């Protein structure tokens, strides 16, 4: 097979994309039997990996990856290609006697590419994951693999400068941005010693922000949060780069960008919300559960203690951001979730942040764009008014300590429009104020509602959405919150 020039990568990709599966099934098999030769070539390797990553079907990927396990997988074709598997555990289970030659061949090929600094290939990352998953923790095999990817500690400035050019640094940075590669890094962090974890995270200096916004890279940060016992060191390595060390407008802007980004928010909300399903999809939860199970024997600190220490490190920056950027945060569901989690879970003085949220919710709630008009805004205000999260097991609200007292702050800003609030889709906010523990304006609120009884009756009798602003399959007659308030009157 003749090695293709770089232009052929574009040509092959364009051909497959324009002509579909038919041409794909002609082109991809041409690479079978040549993987080891191609992956070691400076130009052909990129073509092979591009085809593997972006063109080949799952079965074709399996056939190509199998060639990393030894010459026999390249020479002898699978009788039924549709049943070919690249899962090394399945292959070793079927032929346990082949374990030693397969693992040696795989490790040798992995080492070759790392030493050549050809570490950006998805195929390499998939192969490394298969190798790591089939080692036994604590064995020489597993330890030597960790040594391959863990940078050597540097004791002085000159050594540190040299260390920045180590192949392990280049490898770790590339691994973090693919699915299999990020899992390799996460497992390495989880199984490593405290000293090795520090070296691994140090490799991502000047890359932390990119990790936070990446669909694969952020997992490295979440794993570090879960396994580091030295949270002060972790805060220095990650948070100082992610959001800045000192309070400033630049820091607040960084926090705002993270909080408003679908992936970026995980890096800043995970210490507050943990494994909440609204924050993490099922695929993320599976990876996190894997880490949590392993850390039981590899980390010393209690998980809740670790989490609270991370929350303490983030609290000041997050509260400052809410205090200065409340209006911007209230414009999106992500921003509202950020406000709720931080105000309920952070440490420190929350008064300015609470006042800013209440001020941003002031004004006529009937106006377009007002927080009362959005389901996510209404839910956030309702949660803060209650002063805690609703526990479905006890059917009660678990209040935060010390109390937020948001209901009293909020009422001071919306008193003149409280009847209008009671007639909007966010009417349950007013219901919750009446029911909230420690609300000192109950009599005044009831007085205001009695004055607006006519408006409440009209809202309660009109057909429309429910009190949370959600469309119902069958339209309910009237505003649920307004009805509840009329009953209380």
Give the residues covered by each predicted segment.
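Eukaryotic gene-expression regulator signature that favors modular helical reader/repeat domains
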Residues: 1-489
């Amino acid at each position: 097979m003749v090695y293709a020039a770089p232009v052929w990568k574009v040509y092959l990709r364009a051909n497959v994309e324009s002509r579909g599966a038919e041409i794909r099934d002609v082109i991809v098999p041409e690479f079978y039997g040549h993987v080891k030769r191609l992956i070691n070539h400076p130009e052909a390797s990129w073509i092979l990996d591009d085809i593997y990553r972006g063109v080949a079907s799952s079965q074709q990927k399996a056939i190509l990856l199998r060639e990393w396990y030894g010459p026999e997988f390249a020479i002898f074709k699978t009788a039924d290609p549709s049943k070919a598997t690249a899962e090394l555990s399945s292959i070793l289970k079927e032929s346990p006697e082949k374990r030693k030659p397969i693992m040696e061949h795989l490790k040798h090929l992995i080492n070759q590419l790392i030493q050549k600094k050809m570490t950006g290939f998805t195929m390499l990352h998939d192969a490394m994951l298969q190798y790591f998953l089939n080692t036994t923790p604590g064995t020489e095999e597993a330890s030597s693999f960790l040594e391959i990817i863990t940078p050597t500690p540097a004791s002085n400035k000159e050594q540190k400068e040299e260390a920045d050019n180590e192949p392990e640094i280049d490898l770790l940075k590339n691994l973090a941005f693919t699915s299999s590669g990020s899992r390799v890094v996460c497992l390495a962090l989880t199984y490593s010693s405290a000293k090795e974890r520090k070296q691994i995270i140090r490799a991502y200096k000047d890359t932390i922000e990119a990790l936070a916004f990446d669909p694969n890279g952020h997992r490295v940060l979440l794993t570090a949060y879960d396994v580091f016992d030295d949270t002060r060191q972790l805060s220095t390595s990650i948070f100082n780069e992610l959001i800045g060390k000192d309070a400033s407008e630049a820091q607040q802007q960084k926090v705002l960008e993270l909080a408003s980004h679908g992936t970026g928010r995980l890096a800043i909300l995970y210490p507050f919300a943990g494994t909440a399903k609204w924050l993490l999809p099922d695929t993320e939860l599976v990876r996190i559960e894997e880490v949590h199970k392993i850390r039981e024997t590899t980390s010393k600190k209690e998980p809740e203690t670790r989490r609270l220490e991370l929350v303490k490190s983030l609290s000041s920056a997050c509260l400052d951001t809410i205090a200065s950027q409340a209006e911007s945060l209230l414009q999106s569901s992500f921003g509202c979730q950020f406000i709720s989690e931080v105000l309920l879970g952070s440490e420190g003085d929350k008064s300015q942040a609470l006042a800013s949220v209440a001020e941003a919710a002031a004004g006529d709630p009937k106006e377009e764009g007002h927080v009362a008009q959005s389901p996510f805004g209404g839910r956030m205000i309702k949660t803060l008014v209650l002063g805690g999260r609703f526990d479905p097991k006890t059917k009660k609200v678990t209040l935060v300590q010390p109390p937020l007292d948001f209901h009293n702050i909020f009422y001071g800003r919306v008193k003149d429009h409280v009847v209008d609030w009671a007639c909007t889709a966010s009417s349950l906010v007013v219901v919750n104020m009446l029911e909230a523990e420690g609300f000192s304006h109950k009599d005044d609120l009831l007085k205001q509602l009695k004055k607006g009884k006519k408006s409440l009756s009209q809202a309660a009798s009109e057909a429309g959405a429910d009190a949370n602003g959600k469309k119902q399959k069958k339209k309910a007659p009237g505003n649920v919150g307004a009805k509840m308030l009329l009953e209380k009157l």
